[in-house]
């Protein structure tokens, strides 16, 4: 019998919040430090989002960072989309989930981890021991012995598994180890003779214990770690399913209120609706939690990286809403419920509520504008007797209507139709480069000598706030990513010193430039980055020899720092002006501060007007002229936030922060360099405002010395234009407008002439029309004529040929520019009455050339992208029409 004091067979029904609290409190009582959930935007550049509870501790497991505590416990919010097609369709797949975990960093190991896991499961959550099955790695005899002899689990309820299931590693090299998993058995009455843990109708894994005790080297050998670690994870949603006695995670109190709210909006009942509707409602409930947290943590919808994931989830919510009958906008309404459900565990949701709801409102309204048109086009495509949506059609849905490829695939699959993925990717490659999504695995492999060695240095002392020069000692030199003792003239190097005045690239501000010198040495520093608090100076040795442990003079270029500093302070003023002039909910989505200019990205539903831009510019220049003192303070982050300081979404801050305060105007958490008075900026000028993604705008501006450069460049351009147009500077606009009108008129004349030539050429082709039964059919290749010219020619030929006539043209309008194809089909009214449809016919022809299109029954146009297939497509069109007209 298991050694457990649990006498209750039926576990209590705890809410999701109660389960979370019980887990955390249990480990706090066992001397674990409670840690708040990390952001969904991880520090780790190898992953887009936080995908596991252990991800925030990766540097500790790698030995790159010391832990502040030997034991920790947390409830970590996570996002995974690699199994998105299973969300809503299985009992336990989610995009957003919470992972409860307890961690040991070289402190306790297997015995304690196993005992506490059992105690928590049977005494805190009061699970019946007969409902628990244990899996162990088949070679981990130590863990199996602890389960049997210390905990007292019956041998027939301990299952030995292979490395594929019970040996944890996430790369070819690095820390790894066996794991042991706890499964809940919903049907213990079936006995333990033939336990199949793959049977998810009977078993659910709810707790995973990873014993990180080895390091795998490049040859695959396992060496014991000097310090062994414990990494565990309990899925909150899974434990809620068990304790609340539900058949799936979705019907727990963590998610079901969202599902029920969506059902009410759809005017259906979840309990009695069909399986398809239930799946859609589950997807809506799951995705709502995900998008709410993503926006809260600073992600904005876009076509790149994290933004693309957010946009994809939002658009799937909208589409599944329509599938169950929700036509009106509903995302903000549902997000309010999500915030209410999760506010106790994540109070920042309330703080960011306005931003979350506004982002969802903007993105939903934008997508609804195009969704209906896109759905109609997709319905038209799939209504034909076809088994494949071409890559060009899928790309048109993506590029024109905002349909993610996955959404097109999902709709097509529901109709039993495939999508040409390769064709879509070819179209994408021609027109747009999109950032590749990072791997969803956690990489704990060897990171290369420079990353490993740099992490071993002491922190660099930064003195650049107070001065631009300092004497320092060289403590590290890297050449070709290898540590060296010295570097000579011409060598590209990375240099680490014990102290530096050089600002390292961070917070949107670029790194300083300057020189490192000694008696005969000169190194040009072109950029400075930092890893944690170790500054890495990249540059080239101009003269002399750079040696380890040598004393050097560090010199930042003053003019470079002055320009960068001016643009950084101006960035703070710009954000304040945006909030005052546009909306207080405007927030920073990204920035770049260089010596030439500043770039500021922010959320906004529409372009700013000229007047809004002028008002902001005037407001900022007024603040500059008022000569405000800029105060820089260091204080606890809680005190700074209470005082109203702004923090950038997605940025990581410590317990103590640096605050840049322009009293009454701006207060931000910032580690960048700034002027001491606003008057030092001189002038501020906005040079551009544009959209970079749906709901995201970008302002480019300049301040300080950069403004003079800008006006000098503009003056030179004006002088050159005046000289070229032979007019005074004030007459340039009028002259350009006049030339534009002339060009427009000439273009119209050219099109007219080309169409007349096409018509004349086409009428000359009338003799090539062949008789097919009672009909006349003309199919020809006609290059050098655009779509409108071909349509005009085809219409005239129909009139010329008379009743029962059909004309098909295909060609390359302009081979000098590209090889894009254009097709035109024209049918006489009597052929249309007989059932022929020009739009459908020409669409089928274009598909053979990687294109698509359509139009009216009597006249239609399509395009293509594969000129090598043009002649064959026209030949097939001839065969098809000849057969139909015979």
Swiss-Prot record:
It catalyses: tRNA(Ala) + L-alanine + ATP = L-alanyl-tRNA(Ala) + AMP + diphosphate. GO terms for biological process: alanyl-tRNA aminoacylation. This is Alanine--tRNA ligase. Binds 1 zinc ion per subunit. Its EC number is 6.1.1.7. Belongs to the class-II aminoacyl-tRNA synthetase family. PANTHER family: ALANINE--TRNA LIGASE, CYTOPLASMIC (PTHR11777:SF9), ALANYL-TRNA SYNTHETASE (PTHR11777). PROSITE patterns: AA_TRNA_LIGASE_II_ALA. Zn(2+) binds at residues 568, 572, 670, 674. Its main location: cytoplasm.
């Amino acid at each position: 019998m298991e050694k457990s004091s649990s006498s209750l067979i039926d576990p209590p029904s705890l809410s999701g919040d109660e389960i979370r609290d019980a887990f955390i409190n249990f480990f706090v009582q066992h001397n674990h430090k409670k840690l708040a959930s990390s952001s969904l935007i991880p520090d780790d550049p190898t992953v887009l989002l936080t995908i596991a509870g252990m991800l925030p501790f990766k540097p500790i497991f790698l030995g790159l960072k010391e832990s502040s505590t030997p034991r920790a416990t947390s409830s970590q919010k996570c996002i995974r989309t690699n199994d998105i097609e299973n969300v809503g369709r299985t009992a336990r797949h989610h995009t957003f989930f919470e992972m409860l975990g307890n961690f040991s960093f070289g402190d306790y190991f297997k015995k304690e981890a196993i005992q506490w896991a059992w105690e928590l499961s049977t005494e805190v959550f009061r699970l019946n021991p007969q409902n628990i099955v244990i899996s162990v790695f088949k070679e981990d005899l130590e863990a199996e012995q602890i389960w049997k002899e210390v905990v007292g689990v019956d041998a027939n309820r301990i299952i030995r598994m292979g490395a594929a299931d019970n040996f944890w590693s996430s790369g070819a090299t690095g820390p790894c180890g066996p794991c042991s998993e706890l499964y809940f058995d919903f049907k213990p009455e079936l006995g333990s003779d033939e336990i199949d843990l793959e049977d998810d109708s009977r078993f659910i894994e709810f707790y995973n214990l990873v014993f990180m005790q080895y390091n795998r080297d490049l040859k695959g050998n396992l060496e014991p770690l000097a310090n062994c670690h414990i990494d565990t994870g309990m899925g909150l949603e899974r434990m809620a399913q068990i304790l609340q006695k539900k058949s799936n995670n979705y019907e727990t109190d963590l998610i079901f209120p969202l599902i029920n709210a969506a059902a009410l909006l759809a005017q259906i009942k979840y309990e009695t609706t069909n399986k398809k509707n239930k799946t859609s409602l589950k997807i809506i409930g799951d995705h709502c939690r995900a998008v709410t947290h993503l926006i809260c943590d600073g992600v904005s919808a876009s076509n790149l990286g994290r933004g693309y994931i957010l946009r994809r989830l939002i658009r799937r919510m909208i589409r599944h809403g329509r599938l169950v009958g929700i036509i009106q906008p509903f995302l903000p309404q549902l997000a309010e419920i999500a915030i209410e459900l999760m506010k106790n565990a994540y109070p920042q949701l309330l703080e960011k509520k306005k931003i979350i709801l506004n982002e969802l409102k903007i993105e939903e309204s934008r997508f609804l504008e195009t969704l209906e048109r896109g759905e109609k086009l997709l319905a038209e495509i799939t209504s034909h007797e076809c088994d494949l949506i071409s890559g060009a059609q899928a790309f048109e849905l993506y590029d024109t209507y905002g349909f993610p490829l996955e959404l097109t695939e999902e709709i097509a699959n529901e109709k039993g139709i495939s999508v040409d993925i390769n064709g879509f990717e070819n179209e994408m490659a021609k027109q747009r480069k999109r950032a590749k999504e990072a791997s969803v695995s956690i990489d704990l492999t060897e990171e290369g000598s420079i990353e490993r060695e740099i992490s071993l240095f002491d922190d660099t002392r930064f003195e650049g706030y107070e001065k631009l020069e300092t004497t320092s000692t060289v403590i590290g030199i890297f050449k070709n990513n290898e540590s060296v003792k010295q570097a000579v003239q011409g060598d590209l190097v990375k240099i680490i010193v014990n102290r530096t005045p050089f600002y390292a690239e961070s917070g949107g501000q670029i790194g300083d430039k300057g020189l490192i010198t000694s008696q005969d040495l000169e190194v040009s520093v072109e950029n400075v980055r930092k890893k944690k608090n170790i500054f890495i100076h990249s540059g080239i040795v101009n003269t002399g020899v750079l040696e380890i442990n040598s004393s050097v003079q560090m010199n930042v270029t003053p003019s470079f720092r002055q320009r960068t500093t001016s643009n950084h302070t101006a960035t703070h003023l710009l954000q304040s002006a945006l909030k005052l002039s546009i909306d207080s909910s405007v927030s920073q989505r990204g920035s770049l501060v260089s010596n030439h200019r500043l770039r500021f990205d922010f959320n906004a539903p529409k372009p700013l007007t000229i007047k809004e831009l002028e008002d902001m510019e005037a407001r900022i220049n007024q603040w500059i002229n008022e000569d405000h003192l800029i105060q820089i303070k260091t204080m606890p982050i809680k005190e700074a936030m209470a005082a109203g300081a702004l923090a950038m979404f997605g940025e990581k801050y410590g317990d103590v922060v640096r605050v840049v305060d322009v009293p009454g105007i701006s207060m931000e958490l910032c580690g960048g360099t700034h002027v001491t008075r606003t008057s030092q900026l001189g002038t501020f000028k906005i040079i551009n405002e544009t959209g970079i993604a749906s709901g995201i705008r970008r302002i480019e501006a300049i301040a300080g010395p950069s403004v003079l450069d800008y006006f000098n460049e503009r003056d030179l351009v004006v002088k050159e234009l005046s000289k070229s147009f032979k007019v005074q500077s004030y007459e340039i606009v009028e002259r350009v407008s006049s030339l534009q009108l002339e060009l427009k008129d000439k273009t119209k004349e050219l099109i007219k002439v080309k169409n007349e030539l096409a018509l004349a050429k086409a009428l000359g082709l009338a003799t090539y029309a062949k008789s097919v039964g009672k009909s006349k059919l003309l199919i020809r290749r006609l290059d050098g004529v655009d779509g409108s010219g071909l349509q005009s020619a085809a219409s005239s030929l129909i009139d010329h040929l008379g009743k029962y006539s059909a004309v098909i043209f295909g060609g390359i309008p302009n081979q000098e520019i590209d090889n894009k194809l254009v097709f035109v089909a024209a049918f006489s009214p009597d052929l249309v009455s007989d059932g022929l449809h020009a739009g459908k016919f020409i669409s089928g022809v274009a598909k053979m050339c990687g294109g698509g299109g359509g139009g009216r029954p009597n006249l239609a146009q399509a395009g293509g992208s594969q000129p090598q297939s043009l002649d064959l497509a026209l030949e097939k069109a001839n065969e098809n029409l000849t057969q139909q007209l015979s």
